[in-house]
Amino acid sequence: AEMRNFALRDAQGNEIGVFTGKSPRQAALKAANRGYTEIKLRERGTKKVHIFSGERVQVDKPAGAPAWMPDKIWKPKVKKEGIEKLD
């Protein structure tokens, strides 16, 4: 599977960043982990905008995690809200 590029759009429709991933969800998780909560990702080369709501929750690091990891880590969660089509 090819990596796909998803452009992050702000409320004004400006593309403010690019996240890569095999799926829109994977890209949305990366955006959520940077603190974005309303995530609109336009797939490069298409007119489709995938809309997610995102949040980060702080959790204990998993058992068996490497020692250099902090005890608390941020875990992104996203929920797909729908798809918009651009004209």
Curated annotation (Swiss-Prot):
Q: Which GO biological process categories is it annotated with?
A: DNA protection
Record's keyword terms, sorted: DNA-binding
Pfam hit, one: MC1
Q: From which domain of life does this come?
A: Archaea
- Residues in coiled coil: none
Q: Could you state a single Gene Ontology molecular function term?
A: DNA binding
Q: Which InterPro entries match?
A: MC1 (IPR008674), MC1_sf (IPR036620)
Q: What biological function has been recorded for the protein in this entry?
A: Protects DNA against thermal denaturation and modulates transcription.
- Name listed for the protein in its UniProt record: Chromosomal protein MC1b
Starting at the broadest rank, the lineage of the source organism is: Archaea, Methanobacteriati, Methanobacteriota, Stenosarchaea group, Methanomicrobia
